[in-house]
Structures are given as C-alpha cells and as structure tokens.
C-alpha cells in the first residue's frame, strides 16, 4: 500500500510501472485477455475481456467500477487524442450511470453506445433500401458491432464526400496530431482532422436516442471534462440535406392514340339542332303571311324549285320513323269537313284565311279555319249538332248541271256497286295475292317519288281510299281525293275518319276529272296553281283515252295544279302486250281463269277510243276500257311541261326492288310473300299482274 496525497488515501502499490505513452501504437487485438499477474497494462484496461452484448451490468460490477484505482487516477488527465474509426472494444463507459445503461426495452446496440460517440448523419436520414438486414447492423451480425468487410462503414467525416464501397481501403493513415495507427486493409478509411471543414457534427448521440434503419456506427470523440470550457462548446449546427432523389419522367408507351368517349357534335348537326329550336320557339317565329282571304285578296303563288335529280333509294324510305312533331289541338277543334265555313258576323279575314299553314297542322284532321279556342267554349250539345254538318261536308257531289256520258255512267255505277268488305273479309278474296302485289307496286312508286316532308297530294281516281295509309307513311300534310263514283268517295271519307291520327288533312270530291276541270269542284283554297307536290292516278288513267278531249283535260288538270319539280305517278295497262293477239284468233279474246280481255276490232284507226272489255275476278265486272298509246301519251305530257323520268313493267319493278333495303322487306310485311318466301299468287294471277306498268313524270 502507498499513500496517495491527491486522494488522501492508501492505494495498492503497483508492481510494474506504466510504460511511456507512445504517439503511435497499434490497436489491440480484438480478444486479448488481461494479464493474470495484475500488471499495470492489465490495470489500465487496455484489453478488456469479451462481454456478452445483450447482458446488462450487475450492481456489483457497477460498484467495483467506481472504486479508486490507479488506472483511473492515471487516465483522468490523459490528453484528447484522435481515436480509430473502429468500434470501441469497451462499449460501456466506466462512468455511465446505471439507469442509462439498463433502460428496459432498449436494443442491444443502444447498451453499447458511449456518450462520446455520434451517429452518422447518413444513417439518420436514409431509410433501408431493401428489406434484408444491412451488413454491420444488429440484426445482421452475431455481435452488435459485427463488421462485414464487403461493405464500407459510413462516417461523419465521409458524409460530405463521395464514397465508393469497391475502392480498396488504406492500411494506415496519419492524424492531425501525428499519431499513427494501423488497421486491417478492409477497415474504413482514416478520418479527417477534427477541425477540417469536411465534417461538422450534427449532434451528440445519447443512449436514449432511437436507432435508425441502419445499424449504429460510432465515431470516437475526445473525452471532455467540465474544467475545459473550450471542449464543452460544439460547432454550430449546419443543416445537411441529402441528395435529391432521381426523377423519372412520365413517358408510358401508349397502346393506341388518345381518344374521348364523348361523341363530337359536327357543324351540320349543330345547324340542324338550331333549326329545330328556332322552329319550336314561338318567340322567334314570324307571323305567317296571308295566303288567301275571302275578302277578295289574292294568295301569293308558291315558288318551288325544280327537282335537280330523281329521288334515289337512299334519299328516303317509304316507312320513315313516325312521331307526332306537331302540337296537338283539342278534339273540339278537329274537323273532317271540306271547305271552311265562316262564322256569321265574323270578319272575312284574319283566322278565316285559307289554306292554313300546312307545316303546322294538327295530327287529327282538317282545320276548319276558326280561331283557336272558340269551339272549346261551346256547349257539348252544339258540338254534336255541328259534327253532323261537318260529316256532310266531307264529300261534295257532282256539280249541278254536270252530265255524265253513257260510258262514264256505266263505270261509275259499276264501282258504286262494289261493296266495302273491309280488311278482314278481303283476305278471303280469290285474287288476294294479286291485290297485295298491286298494293306493293303502288307503295314502291309512292316511296320513290313522294315529296317529303309535309307534301301535298292530289289523288285522281282515289276509289275507296285504299292508298290513304300509304300516303300517311309518306308523312304528307294535305290529301285531296277525287273519283267519279260518289259512293266510293263516301267510303274513302269514312275510312279516313277511322284512321287513328292520320297526321294530314283530307278532302274528298265526287267529280269526273277527265271531262271537266278541277276548278268546278275544288274550293278556292285548294285550286291554287302549282299547289301540289304529287299527282297520282292508279289503275284509272286509261279511262281518259276515250277521246282526245278527255285525254287533254286529264293532262291539263295534272299540269295546272302540279308545281315545278313535282312528280306525276300512275299505273296503266301495257298496250303493247294487249295488242299481241294471235293471228288466227277470230274471237279477239284472251285470258285465263283470273282475267279475260276481249276486243271489238283488231285494228283501230287513230290513237284514241280503241276500247276493249276487261274482266277481273272479284274486281272488275266487264266494263269498257281504252288502250293508252304510249307514244301519244308521252307527247301530250311533253306539251304540258311533263318529262318522263320512270317507266317499268310490274315484273321489272319486282326484279329491281325485291332486294332493296326500303321495299324488299315490304314484300313480307304486306303479305306478298309468306314466312317461307312463297308468293300468294298463282300463275294466272302473275300473268294478270304483268299486263300493267308504272310510270313517273316530272313537271319542268
């Protein structure tokens, strides 16, 4: 024992004196055991025994560490020196208090920290780039300070430099104070001087700080004492920002060109929508110009433009979509009457003018010319009384003093005697196949040449109104029907009344259109020149070729009321086929079980009046008819400004239109063909059908 004057106590006397401190010494081997002889090197704790990393210090060991020892006395005044970058072999400092070394739940690496060691700034700011453990971390090494030579140790000294893990490490380096040390070739490079500008510590790590994603790497710092104020002050903190992450520009590979699910609106569609909006807006509509007045005003003549080309199959369809695009009117304002009647005491002008605006008609029937709403104020009893009067005005009989010729009277009496059997009983006709085929032919002609929309039709020889529904499908605005048989005209008017929402106005007159002008029977508002878009004559025009006067009157009535560009359509027997009589046939008769034709003479002088008797089962009962000389007919039409645009026999029309988009499906809808594609006509009916042909003329 020796007396220590500084501590004022006896301390054990050392047997071996401490060797002089060297400026350069090699680090001790990692697992050196202390000398058993109690030498001074063993007392200096240069080579502490290996410790179990997760084991905490006991209370006895903590008390022993605070005992006065010569090593503590000799090491208190040791000057600061640069330490190696290697992890310290004594992870637990002797002066570390017990509570900070044994904190519950802390990691084993936190127990090995020293107050004089700081974490690398890169280890605090960077996250783990991959899920596996990094070399040197507590999870990837058996020892908390395990080291893998394949990875370089990051240091605060090198945090501001560009590091390379593949660069070979130096075996020795020199510190700022000249002290040298030696380390393995795979260890970290030598630290820069403490006062170098390349390193400024971020903060001093304490055991309570949480560890980062990387394993803690400690850099030994000089031991500071309270007596040295210069070492208690740290360099001011300088924020250190990591390098910005690499930005990859968004440039995906497109599989297709960019597009939109929205349907674009084209300029023509916009113009169409604006036109519809303008027509439906009452504030933008101008008052209709006065067309006719019973006060004596003259109606302005329309100025239609001639047709530039013939209508094609793609221009329109015979069955366009049907909808009510006109405003509906109360039932009390719907009239089936013919000529308008003015209210007594009412002014002759104003709403009594006629014809009305055909483009704004009611879907139920005729407009009677009275102010809207007036009939709605009448009592129901008055309306019932007026209904009878309106029904009486539907048909106008022959003009007073008009006398029919004997042959015309025979024809009129024949058709008047034909009963109206209706659609149901018509199916039992022995020539139902031929009738349906003739209706299909008329539908083709109407579909090809009808004026759309809101056309005006003059039907000469309307019969019982069998074509009313066909013209309804063409969406016409006005229909005027005339026939020589007054009973047939009455039946046509009755059929029109039974139509649900016909969509057009209809007027019917009993009149001989081949002997007298139409102005004798038509009301003033319906006999305006160039008023009609279509004039039709179906299976009746051949009656006009009794003489030249009737033929010319027929052409005059057509040409006068047909506008420029309007179409005149019709069906007539083919005179060339009828004149193909056998030379040895003395009876001048031919036909089959369906029809028969008998001439009175084989050769006839002139082009008019060549008559024959025609019989058709369940249709025509031996009435006189006349051949139509085609060349003469075309010549008469040309004199009146009508140009031939269409001429085909019935079998040619069938061959041409049976596969068309518009008229091919009509063969099945109208019953010409059944579901198996079989025709309802037999050979005799087909022979009778081929006796006729269809035509169309355009007014120039």
Swiss-Prot record:
Binding site for mRNA: 438-439
CDD domains for this protein: AdoMet_MTases (cd02440)
Reactions catalysed, as given in the entry: a 5'-end (5'-triphosphoguanosine)-ribonucleoside in mRNA + S-adenosyl-L-methionine = a 5'-end (N(7)-methyl 5'-triphosphoguanosine)-ribonucleoside in mRNA + S-adenosyl-L-homocysteine
Coiled coil: none
Gene3D superfamilies per record: Vaccinia Virus protein VP39 (3.40.50.150)
Compositionally skewed regions (Basic and acidic residues) per UniProt: 1-10, 52-67
Site (mRNA cap binding): 464, 470, 495, 542, 625, 692
Its biological purpose: Responsible for methylating the 5'-cap structure of mRNAs.
The protein, known as: mRNA cap guanine-N(7) methyltransferase
Organism from which the protein derives: Cryptococcus neoformans var. neoformans serotype D (strain B-3501A) (Filobasidiella neoformans)
Lineage, opening ranks: Eukaryota, Fungi, Dikarya, Basidiomycota, Agaricomycotina
